[in-house]
UniProtKB/Swiss-Prot annotation:
The lineage of its organism: Bacteria, Bacillati, Actinomycetota, Actinomycetes, Mycobacteriales. One of its GO terms (molecular function) is structural constituent of ribosome. Part of the 50S ribosomal subunit. Forms a cluster with proteins L3 and L19. In the 70S ribosome, L14 and L19 interact and together make contacts with the 16S rRNA in bridges B5 and B8. This is Large ribosomal subunit protein uL14. One of its GO terms (biological process) is translation.
């Protein structure tokens, strides 16, 4: 569960390493974002020479959370870290590679390009 001021690792090769959540999209009083939800964030740490610069405001979709999430079949899924993938305005990923597994919820929320780039879908 990601909320305002949460720091999230970036799981793609855009050049950003860590982002800070500014807003959870999906309603004026929405507090938390889970796997497959879109947030607005600012870049807090970036590699030199990357496409993304520190201080840039970006949109990102959450791909991993440490808070467990209950699936419709009764099972739970949780990861070791909170991670996100930076996206463009049309919901396509900004990077060309994705690192680490992603949640199956991304397929249900129509982020097919992220699912196809990911090495593993859990």
């Amino acid at each position: 569960m990601i909320q305002q001021e949460s720091r999230v690792r970036v799981a793609d090769n855009t050049g950003a390493k860590e982002i800070l959540c500014i807003r959870v999209l999906g309603g004026s009083s929405r507090r938390y974002a889970g796997i497959g939800d879109v947030i607005v964030a600012t870049v807090k740490d970036a590699i030199p020479g990357g496409n993304i610069k520190k201080g840039e405001v970006v949109k990102a979709v959450i791909v991993r959370t440490t808070k467990e999430r209950r699936r419709p079949d009764g099972s739970y899924i949780k990861f070791d870290e909170n991670a996100a993938v930076l996206i463009k305005a049309d919901s396509d990923p900004r990077g060309t590679r994705i690192f680490g597994p992603v949640g199956r919820e991304l397929r249900e929320k129509k982020f097919m390009k992220i699912v196809s780039l990911a090495p593993e879908v859990l």
